[in-house]
From Swiss-Prot:
This is UDP-glycosyltransferase 2. Highly expressed in roots. Expressed in leaves and stems. UDP-alpha-D-glucose binds at residues 283, 348-349, 366-374, 388-391. Glycosyltransferase that possesses isoflavonoids 4'-O- and 7-O-glucosyltransferase activities. Shows a successive glucosylation toward the acceptors producing their corresponding 4',7-O-diglucosides. Can use genistein, formononetin, daidzein, liquiritigenin and naringenin as substrates. Also shows a 3'-O-glucosylation activity in vitro. Its EC number is 2.4.1.-. Keywords: Glycosyltransferase, Transferase. One of its GO terms (molecular function) is UDP-glucosyltransferase activity. It comes from the Eukaryota. InterPro entries: UDP-glycosyltransf_plant, UDP_glucos_trans, UDP_glycos_trans_CS.
Length: 472
């Protein structure tokens, strides 16, 4: 019976993909281990439709067919109480995991009886107290947290009790507070926090307090980053006597998946080297009709070649089955006027393959950490347009600390003007500042490859983890 590591991802698509890639990474270098991924299987209730259950199911089926060493264990996803407040998607996923605690605990017991269970790795958004989840398991089965974003936002999270205390004493609406924690050089204020986490009394703030407390009590924290990209912050966290051991094993990025049924790659084949800017905003990055039209105007003004993945908000449609056409979403004549320079596709495109294509020279991103790492690993400079969760903080880190991006600035309502987008795209692709960012990103591409190579910092961290598991 093989030693088994159980991975418990959040149901959000980016979190699931990152956890699967972690499992693949473990198996690549330590094939004597077995990987089981626990999957909360959602219903089609309104509270879960945000997470594109069908696409997750298709992705899981692909992994099952191509990597038999990874097995999936499905667990019923609890439904949310009718009095659950309206929450943003990442907090809905947190609540769904919290209400599924008992089902997950039973699943862990079942897996422990059927395998030689060595460790459990839990996504940070499934932050239920590990003692509750593992109370009936052998005490030698250690629990780790997997943090799918970078060390900078992890530091903010682990220091959140102190930040919360400061907010409680000094919080005034619309008056930002400077955030200072060891190792953080970037100029971050409470304005960079997600809207739902600025008020110290609301649900989000209380959840972050609980997450910080729970993560500090774990056996270790596995981070999807590498030392060269966030060196000072990683050192500061490692030297903090109250933080569990850190294992920086990244960059863990998605392997190419899905068919290019929209012809993105063949279109790129016909474009000049490094001439195309990709606009793609993640699985939950959707926009209103007004914002979509503004993006279109901005792209046309920029006079740059572009590949744009469009995802419209649900209220843009008359019904779920009757989505508006691209012509209806765009300004009149836009698709015809830009057909020689641009390609617009709906909902999804093979982002990893696109970023690796020689024709791509820039990336307008929502600042999700998976996307940031994918761009870094291909040496593609970015324009940072955050949408939700920790992404505004990521923007500051990308621009000021990592220096791999330009900031796309929005108004107080979160709206980005055509002029702002057009100027940033042109600056990224044509200016001396854009060239500097491209050179910096290319250096980080080399550092990322070195970290993952034999003897590299991330490879050493993974080997250390595997040794701990095998000896437990």
């Amino acid at each position: 019976m093989k030693d088994t590591i159980v991975l418990y991802p959040n149901i959000g698509r980016g979190h699931l993909v990152s956890m699967v890639e972690l499992g693949k990474l473990i198996l690549t270098h330590h094939p004597s281990l077995s990987i089981t991924i626990l999957i909360l299987t959602p219903s089609t209730t309104p509270s879960t439709t945000t997470f594109a259950c069908d696409s997750n199911a298709q992705y899981i089926a692909t992994v099952t067919a191509t990597i038999p060493a990874i097995t999936f264990h499905h667990v019923p996803l609890a439904t949310l109480p009718s009095n659950t407040p309206s929450l943003p998607p990442h907090l809905v996923s947190l609540e769904l995991a919290r209400h599924s605690t008992q089902n997950v605990a039973v699943a862990f017991q079942t897996l422990a009886k059927a395998s030689n269970l060595k460790a459990i790795i839990i996504d940070l958004l499934n932050f239920n107290d590990p003692k509750t989840l593992t109370q009936n398991l052998n005490k030698n089965i250690h629990t780790y947290f997997y943090y799918t974003s970078g060390a900078s936002t992890l530091a903010l999270l682990l220091h959140y009790p102190t930040i919360h205390e400061t907010l409680t004493k000094n919080y005034v609406k619309d008056q930002p507070l400077q955030i200072q924690i060891p190792g953080l050089r970037a100029n971050i204020t409470t304005d960079d926090f997600a809207k739902d986490s600025k008020d110290p009394s609301n649900y989000s703030s209380q959840a972050f307090l609980k997450i910080a407390e729970t993560m500090r009590g774990s056996f270790g924290i596995i981070i999807n980053t590498f030392e060269a990209i966030e060196e000072e912050l990683i050192r500061a966290l490692s030297e903090d006597g109250t933080v569990p051991p850190l294992f920086c094993i990244g960059p863990v990025i998605s392997a190419p998946y899905g068919e290019d049924d929209k012809g993105c790659l063949s279109w790129l084949d016909s474009q000049p080297s490094q001439s195309v800017v990709l606009l793609c905003f993640g699985s939950m990055g959707s926009f209103s009709r007004t914002q979509l039209k503004e993006i279109a105007v901005g792209l046309e003004k920029s006079e740059q070649r572009f590949l744009w993945v469009v995802r419209a908000e649900l209220d843009c449609a008359d019904s779920v089955d009757e989505q508006p056409s691209l012509d209806e979403l765009m300004p009149g004549g836009f698709l015809e006027r830009t057909k020689e320079k641009g390609l617009v596709v709906r909902d999804w495109a093979p982002q990893v393959q696109i970023l690796s294509h020689d024709s791509v020279g820039g990336f307008v991103t929502h600042c999700g950490w998976n996307s940031v790492l994918e761009a870094v690993c291909e040496g593609v400079p970015m324009a940072a347009w955050p949408l939700y969760a920790e992404q505004r903080v990521n923007r500051v880190i990308m621009v000021e600390d990592m220096k791999v991006a330009l900031a796309v600035n929005e108004d107080k309502a979160g709206f980005v003007s055509a002029t702002e987008l057009g100027d940033r795209v042109r600056e990224l692709m044509e200016s001396d500042k854009g060239k500097e960012i491209r050179q910096r990103t290319f250096k980080m591409k080399i550092s990322a490859a070195e970290a993952m190579a034999e003897g590299g910092t991330s490879r050493v961290a993974l080997d250390k983890l595997a040794k701990l598991w095998k000896e437990s």
